[in-house]
């Protein structure tokens, strides 16, 4: 359900806004609605990841069921987002157009199309292993990924990680 090479997928996308939405989704685990519609007041700046200590950028969002959350992404992607918002007033991408671009990119790179949700799967797995590599306990890493995905039940995160 995840992409074999999400970076390659993102690189072949022709529209820079679609590329940016894909980077945001891949790096933050946001659902498509959160990654394709961002207003300036959601931007929270750059800080340190509380688990790894690396520099990350934060973004407030309202997720599924009206649940508030904080997404994080690389400072580079955040910088691109800030630039886009400075030029256009907000970041707004057609979800259908974005899905079509992902489908085309999957075809061009020989990967199975897994929708935009496939990038959430990539995020979940890579984030979990990043936390484990930083010596975060299994339970804490699982809880962190679950929270970052906006899930209320850890059982759903087991599914994303292929642990069920």
Walk through the language-model features, giving the residues of each.
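Catalytic phosphate/metal-binding cores of nucleic-acid and nucleotide-processing enzymes, i.e., regions
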Residues: 15, 40, 47-49, 59, ...
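Basic, Lys/Arg- and aromatic-enriched nucleic-acid-binding interface segment
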Residues: 3-32, 139
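Conserved tyrosine-mediated DNA breakage-rejoining catalytic core shared by Y-recombinases
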Residues: 37-80
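DNA major-groove recognition helix of helix-turn-helix
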Residues: 34, 39, 160-161
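Active-site/catalytic core of tyrosine-dependent DNA strand-transfer enzymes
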Residues: 72-130
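Catalytic-site neighborhood detector that most strongly recognizes the C-terminal catalytic loop/helix
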Residues: 65, 148-164
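Active-site-proximal segment of tyrosine recombinases
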Residues: 35, 114, 124, 132-150
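Short, leucine-enriched amphipathic alpha-helices that occur as contiguous helical runs
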Residues: 6, 17-19, 99, 120-121, ...
């Amino acid at each position: 359900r995840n992409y074999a090479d999400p970076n390659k997928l993102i690189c072949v996308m022709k529209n820079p806004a679609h590329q940016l939405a894909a980077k945001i989704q891949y790096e933050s685990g946001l659902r498509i609605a959160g990654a394709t519609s961002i207003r300036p007041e959601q931007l929270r700046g750059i800080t340190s990841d509380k688990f790894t200590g690396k520099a990350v950028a934060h973004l407030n969002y309202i997720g599924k069921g009206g649940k508030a959350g904080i997404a994080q992404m690389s400072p580079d992607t955040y910088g691109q987002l800030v630039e886009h918002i400075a030029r256009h007033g907000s970041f707004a991408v057609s979800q259908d157009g974005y899905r079509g671009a992902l489908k085309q990119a999957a075809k061009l790179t020989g990967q199975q199309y897994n929708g935009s949700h496939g990038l959430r799967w990539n995020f979940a797995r890579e984030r979990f292993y990043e936390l484990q590599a930083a010596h975060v306990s299994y339970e804490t890493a699982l809880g962190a990924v679950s929270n970052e995905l906006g899930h209320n039940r850890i059982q759903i995160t087991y599914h994303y990680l292929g642990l069920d």
